[in-house]
Structures are given as structure tokens and as C-alpha cells.
Amino acid sequence: MKKSFKKITALLLTVLLVGALCLPAIAKPTEWISQSLSDIPIIRISGDGEKLIDEDGNKVFHYKDIGSVFKNDDDDGDDKETYRSIANILKPFLIQGLMFNNWDPYYENLQKEIGELFEHSLLDKNGNPQYGTGLRPERIEKMENVRHHDQAWRTPDGVKYYVQDRYWFYYDWRLDPIETADELKAFIDDILASTGCEQVGIIASCLGTNVVTAYLAVYPEHAAAHVRGVAYDGSVTMGAEMLSEAISGKFNIDAAAINRALRDCNAIGMFNVDEFVNVTLDMVADTGLLDNMLAIPKKLVYYRIVKGATSALALSTFYTWPSYWACVSPEDYDTAMEYVFGPEGSEKRTEYAGLIAKIENYNAVVRQHIPEILTGAVQSGVHFGVISKYGFQTLPICETNYLISDQFASVGRSSFGATTGTIYEDLSDEYLAARREAGFGDYLSPDGQIDASTCLFPESTWFIKGSSHSNWSDWELRLLYDIASSKEQLTVKDSCWPSRFVVYSYTNPDEDSDGEIEAMTTENCDTENWEADDSAKNANPFQKVIKAIKVWFGWLRALFDKLFRK
């Protein structure tokens, strides 16, 4: 890996794809709060948090390690590599690109320079691991042990039961979810053989939900016979805007959205943001400064290079991973394929034919049939439940950054179909009144943002406001455990949660506590860490000038306060 300052150059060039991906990087470990005693093994499968290594045992670079690129541990004082790296990207941009409208050299060098940072984490052009990368030996050994040895606990009376954290299914989260589903089936079979049980339960989160959905698609009979219940938390099966829109041309740089995202990160303890930064972003957003700064570059350059730059960034970072392609929404899929691989018959389509075959197979087998796959599983006897989280700003550069979300995916997607308002507007009074008149009042959230009646499984979908995508609280685990292990289909009327809609008080990182939940009411539902206001967009010119002046003076006060603060 090259010098740290070259890494910084790459970091700056990849910020659009990387920045918000750091959001789920600090999932808080929790201690189990016993809720009930399951008579079947419970399999846990999570997202992309598992550390991967190469053939020499070195940790593979992960976006969660992005902060480490600023450490100058290999800095020998020689700036030649810095200049070469920058020149390799800027020269073709300025000369062949801007002067002669030939952008191919720029795309090629952009992909090459950034790809060196992510080299060992990239899959090859067939979607297979390189450099001997994969799971750590100790994870493989642990899985081998638990799959072949009964992990049951016993009560003082000798009754056998299973807790929620003994059967972790570890996997290389970059790979094709359908291939991983084959491994999951084998894991289930071995557990059944070693325990003598006839069924298991499954708790899945984030990318793990794609693996489980693929398993249900490929092995429906096996699931019907051997899976009692499936519980999803923070699902990305229907797509995740931050991964889907980033490669389908849906960019909308929004300073106010960036500010809201920073306030969220500050509130949940990811990092501290100086209030002056927030005030500055407010000023940039409310005065229209950012829009004016970007107007000319956007007009002259953006539309000419967006597809080529998207392809270069995607294939040098995260999109040789079929697992991330599984998070592309059905609506964005065709556009994303063209942005990243070019039109049918293109050179890149041929070059990446093996990878594309896996991506398209998942699309044909899973993505295009998700409602049928899940309803089919339920009809075959598999119990199913969903937790959808919200109360946070999604990726600030997403075109749909106005949707209510868990930072990663919108509620409409993670809940499999809830009708929602936006961060700017609740569902209209007319809509809510009509739904109540039609008998759906119980499905409406007290904050006026969600109608759960349109979910794929409205009776077994729960909503938690104030818990982010990266937070897996004990309160969620209680419910997930019950959904997966219960001998009957659990519903919102008979679960351990006090309501279909709950509010979560986020854990203070400095306190040894996992927070609390309570039934949502009109009094406690205002949990957002910011106020979203788009009134300026529809204001007349005079109103905009007045607001800009007020914001400008507010920023000057904040600046002087910071400069002369004692």
C-alpha cells in the first residue's frame, strides 16, 4: 500500500461513495436480556462488519478503516509519490478531458489510483476473492465447532434451550448472496444433525437479510421444513438508497442534508462536530452559496463525466461485490448497470462478464420476486417479522435524501412497503383522515409519518424511531428472538414490545446502558436531532434575500464567537 498522502488523495476522490458508508461502522455490541427460552437453535447473520484477511493474515482494507488513511505511519518525507498520484488523475482530466473532450484516460487513471487503496478488498472480474482474502481462520474454526456440537443451555430443571448468540453464521460479505445461501443451507443442516432439532430460527440484519432472502428463494422446500421463523432488522432486501442511488446518477449535493447527517452522527456518539461547522453549513445552505458554486461546474463538466466517473469509482471501491449489488433497488437496477458497465455490448460488459452473470442471476432469481418469495415462505408455514428503524437523515448526496430512514435505507424499503411522509412533511391530514375512516387508524404512527397498513406484512412489522441502522439494541434482539423462535406467528398485538410504533432513547456512549423503549405517542415522538425546513425553496426572491441576510449575520456571530472564545 502506498504512502499515506496518496491514500488521502484517493480518499478525497472517493468521498461521495465512501463518506456515508462510514455511518454503520460503530454498531454497538449488546448484552443479552433474556426474554424467553427457545427450544430451537437461533442462527444470527449480520452485515459487513466481519473482519476479512488476506493470505498473509493481514486485515483487508475496509471502508470502516477510512480514518486510518490519515495516519502518516509510512511517511518518509518524499513528496514525489504524492505529486505523481495527483498528476495521474488531474492531467488527463485537464488536458484530454477539458481541452479535447476525451475523458477515457481520466476514467482509467481514476479507477487505477483509487483501486490501489482498495486492492485487496476488490473481487476479481468474475466476482471471486483475490489474494487469498476471506474469513479469519478463528471464525471458520468457531463455525465448525458450533455446527457439529450442540450449543444448548439447560435450566436448573434440566430443560434444554438455546440463546441468541451461539450460532453465528460468518460469511464473506462481499460475495454473491446466492452462493452464500448455499453455505447457509449447509450450516442449517449440520446444526439440525448435531442438535437433533427439526427446525431453526433465523435473525438477520443488513446484508444478512439478502442472504436469507436468497436462501428462501433457492431452497423454499428446505425452509418450509426446517425454518420456524425469520426476523429481519434493518433490512436492505428491497434496496438501500445510499448504495443504489450512488451508482445510478441520482446525485443531489445538499448542504442542509449534510448538516443533518452530522447532527445525527454527533447525537449517537459516532464523533463530535463543532457547532461552528453546523452553523457554516446552515449558512451555505440557506444563502444558496453551494448551489451557486456548483452551477457552472455542473453545467460544463458534471453531465459529461458522470457515467464514466461513476463506473471508475464503483469498480475501484465497492461494486465488484455482488452483495452490494443486491442492495440496488429494482427501480435503479437497469440504470446502475449501464452507469457502471456501460451499454449492452460494451467493452466493460465483456471484461466483467463473470461478475455481471452473478449480479444478473441475483436480479432474476431474487430481486424481481421479493414479495412472492417472502409471502411464499409465510404461506408454507415460516413465521416472519420485520423491524424498521427511522428518525435519521440518509446519505446527504442521495436524490431522495428527504425520505425518512435509518441512515442507510428508507422506511418504505426496510418495512417492505409502508407509506410514509418525508423529513419535511408528514402524511397529509386528508390522507390520515381517509385512512382512519377506512378503518386503518391503528396502522398510523402517532408522529403522522407512517401508514403501516400498506406493508407486505402489516401485522408483523414493527417500527422503532430513534434507533439507527448501526444500532442493534437489546430491545430489538428481544423481539427478533421471539419472532424467530415462537411456535406461533407473532403479531404486533402479542409481542414483547408495548406497541407497533415505539420510541427508543439512544444510549449515551459514556453510560453502561442500552437505553429504553416506550410506546410512541404524540408527546414523545419528536426525536429527530434536527429540524428539516425546505420553506426557502418556495420563497419569493425578497424572502430569500431577507433570510440570507439573517443567516449571514448569524454565521458572523458564530465566527467571532469561535475566534474570540476564551
For the regions a protein language model found, what residue spans apply to each?
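Sec-dependent N-terminal signal peptides of Gram-positive bacterial secreted proteins and lipoproteins
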Residues: 6-27
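A structural signal for short coil/turn segments at secondary-structure junctions
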Residues: 12, 195, 223, 379-380
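N-terminal non-catalytic accessory region
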Residues: 28-203, 210-265, 393, 405-406, ...
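N-terminal secretory signal peptides that target proteins for export/translocation
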Residues: 1-4
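Alpha/beta-hydrolase fold catalytic core
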Residues: 164-178, 306-402
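Alpha/beta-hydrolase-fold enzymes
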Residues: 255-350
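Short hydrophobic helices that act as membrane-entry/anchoring signals
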Residues: 88, 543-565
